[in-house]
Amino acid sequence: MAPEMNNKLSYGEKKRAYVTFLAGTGDYVKGVVGLAKGLRKTKSKYPLVVAVLPDVPADHRRQLLDQGCVIKEIQPVYPPDNQTQFAMAYYVLNYSKLRIWKFVEYSKLIYLDGDIQVFENIDHLFDLPDGNFYAVKDCFCEKTWSHTPQYKIGYCQQCPDKVTWPESELGPKPPLYFNAGMFVYEPSLPTYYNLLETLKVVPPTPFAEQDFLNMYFKDIYKPIPPVYNLVLAMLWRHPENIELNEAKVVHYCAAGAKPWRFTGQEGNMEREDIKMLVEKWWDIYNDESLDYKNFNVHCGQKEDVHRKPKTLPQFFTDLSEADVLQCAKAPSAA
């Protein structure tokens, strides 16, 4: 499905960056600030690009600029009209992430959700061979997957031998499926336009853009170890597959796990390993020595910062008023 990703810069040194996505007026900006500081702590050589929808307010954009982020405003991407029930209402926003394929001023990008923290340098992932889509395999064991045959029969690709896939009853085993909260990809205009055209003819499914990206890139998907996107549910679903002290990237995607909202009251949030990971996130967020010190004018970005946020269509406005229009996170096993 994916066209050749060969839209390279033909001159100068390859540009690389990390990229994340932010929407709405909620508190998810704290996650992105924390991510920027985490990348700085690991001494990453590359900037953090934040793709923002038009409704992200000026004060949030200023916070991100003050942390050295590059702001790139994008327009929403809407799925075809249908009656799909998304696993979470705000997953519909995630289709806007497709816009990051048009950031062709960069030769390679690593996408990270705003509820992710990077605890060890992962710049080496930029050196993975071109032409592939790299991400970590997801887990099918949480209730958000209850609509799938995998969940119903207890099958998970994290432990495929525990419950084998019944080919005689359900047909061929599903292809490998990644969590779209973190992935390594190459921007490409041909791919970007083909993604948008394909979206017009592929019916939306419960996990929104994550299902779509899995379908689109299935032929070039290459799994990478779970240390590069530790989905928290792995700690209680597949502890045998996890060495917590080796995790380089932690994805705070379980219900109640967002550090800036953490109460410890939701299921599994009383675990000591979860509390430790939340504390590690706060240690980075509160570390003033990690703040980006930039005494120069933010050239070329003033217009984005001071422009009055645009009003999105009524559906997005309704989500915002319901306090769910925030940074779109990838669906996960949690």
Swiss-Prot record:
Keyword Transferase assigned: yes
Active site: 97
Induction of expression: Induced by cold in a DREB1A-dependent manner; this induction is accompanied by a reduction in trimethylation of 'Lys-27' of histone H3 (H3K27me3) in GOLS3 promoter. Induced by methylviologen (MV), a superoxide radical generating drug.
Cofactor: a divalent metal cation
CDD domains to which the protein is assigned, alphabetical: GT8_Glycogenin
Lineage of origin: Eukaryota, Viridiplantae, Streptophyta, Embryophyta, Tracheophyta
Function recorded in the entry: Galactinol synthase involved in the biosynthesis of raffinose family oligosaccharides (RFOs) that function as osmoprotectants. May promote plant stress tolerance.
Annotated PANTHER family: GLYCOGENIN SUBFAMILY MEMBER
Subcellular location: Cytoplasm
Residues annotated as binding Mn(2+): 113, 115, 251
A molecular-function term among this protein's GO annotations: metal ion binding
Keywords annotated in UniProt: Carbohydrate metabolism, Cytoplasm, Galactose metabolism, Glycosyltransferase, Manganese, Metal-binding, Transferase
GO terms for biological process, alphabetical: galactose metabolic process; response to cold; response to oxidative stress
Family under the similarity heading: Belongs to the glycosyltransferase 8 family. Galactosyltransferase subfamily.
Organism: Arabidopsis thaliana
Catalysed reaction, written as an equation: myo-inositol + UDP-alpha-D-galactose = alpha-D-galactosyl-(1->3)-1D-myo-inositol + UDP + H(+)
Matches recorded under InterPro entries: Glyco_trans_8, GNT1/Glycosyltrans_8, Nucleotide-diphossugar_trans
GO cellular component: cytoplasm
Protein name according to UniProt: Galactinol synthase 3
EC number(s) on file: 2.4.1.123
Top class in the EC scheme: transferase
